[in-house]
Amino acid sequence: MSKRKTGALRKEQNSKKMHKITTYYNNESNNTIDFNQTHKIKKSIELVPQSVNQENYILNLMDNSKDIVVVYGPAGTGKTYLGMLAALKALRQGDCKKIILTRPAVAVDDEKHGFLPGDINSKMEPWVRPLLDILKEYYSMKEVEYMLKEQIIEITPLAFCRGRNFKNAWVILDEAQNATPSQIKMLMTRISFGSKIIITGDVEQTDRRTKDNGLLDLTYRLTQNPVSEIGLSEFSVKDIRRHRIIEKVLKLYD
């Protein structure tokens, strides 16, 4: 290939690259974000079950007739991970306009975090870090910061959900065993059109007294009086996929 043709080809490639960059920043300046642009997406979002119980959970997540999905079981079984992936997939497909991440602000055992400076995202970030870590697998830090700023991804304490109406949103309540029965009832009654609520947790890993364990209370109520619009999934130690040692650690503390 001649130098002239090589130079022309390089110039054309640079022009296309600059067009992509210009489009990207124009979209940001116009306060829009296109989740379908291939240069903005790290990888496709696929929910692949690795056990029968995970398959049941994914079916509940993808079932439009299930307005609320409740899942409980030990650490490392994919409760939070699969729930977050389903929410991101719904957001990317335009099935919802935002994702709301929440959890009870209850410290592990006697651990005290004290006062955290900054806005609500900064204050809640340590509490929802596992959910944000999943988000960062699929979007760059710049994209994550943008979505937080525009409240496409919203972080809120569970107590702040009182009085709100969640419309066209997927809401994920993590560590639900640390919520009280009244808090979980409050959250579920906030649902509105086009929304889904995912409630995850481990009834055995509560930092509250047993009678205050909202997740344990909810699962008991659902087993006694099933509701067709609420999907219920249970995981066991056999569903642990994070690391094989977790099952042995849990048995060690039984």
Predicted regions and their residues:
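Interdomain "pre-motor" coupling segment immediately N-terminal to P-loop NTPase/helicase cores
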Residues: 1-37
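Conserved helicase motor core of SF1/SF2 NTP-dependent helicases
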Residues: 2-4, 16, 37-46, 54-60, ...
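Residue-level marker of regulatory loop/turn positions in helix-turn-helix DNA-binding domains and
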Residues: 50
